Amino acid sequence: MKEEQIKQIVEQVIKTFEEAQSVPMEVPVEVSARHIHLSKEHISLLFGSEDQLSIIKELSQPGQFQYDKRVTLIGPKGSIGNVAILGPSRDETQVEISYTDARALGIKPPLRESGDLQDTAGIIIATGHKAINLEGGVMIAKRHIHMTPKDAEVFHVKDGEHVKVRIESKRPIVLEDVLVRVNEKYGLSMHIDHDEGNAAAYQPGTTGKMIK
């Protein structure tokens, strides 16, 4: 191979690398307030049937929505009312709260990825007239980024990878150990809880810059 050809190849590699580095690594950030995903069984026990629930708002993730009804969480130390119910229903009930919520309720839920319910905390879930004792299912959700496979290619990450994200706000902070979740059905968005949002002085429209 001639020296000129080698030079052209090296220049192309450098150009490709620089272009990759120049790709904006920003993602929209959303604060995920305390909420619950109910199983069909628990919807029936609390409300009679799923027909009693109406969708009032579509969420940023395709196919996800909020119902019109709310529940109260009751723990050994206190209770938290007006907790949103998100749909669609799941195979198992899952409750996502913050560390501040956990202290107010008097429980010690683990930090988990959504869907990992083994050895999670219990809680009483109540409506105006009915209540169920959930033996497990309460967690503090790990901060994470939803993205499509195409997004993952652009950001040079893969499903299950952990990254750092600098929250671009009036009170910028760097969040480590942010889980990347990749699926065709997802929409690009980073989810943090209220504790993390308050620490960063979050406001709607806040973005995060991914740090590899």
Curated annotation (Swiss-Prot):
Keyword rRNA processing: no
A biological process from GO: propanediol catabolic process
Binding site for Zn(2+) 1: 35, 37, 96
EC numbers for this chain: 2.3.1.222
GO-annotated molecular function: acyltransferase activity, transferring groups other than amino-acyl groups; metal ion binding
Pathway: Polyol metabolism; 1,2-propanediol degradation
Family of this protein: Belongs to the PduL family.
Name of the featured protein: Phosphate propanoyltransferase
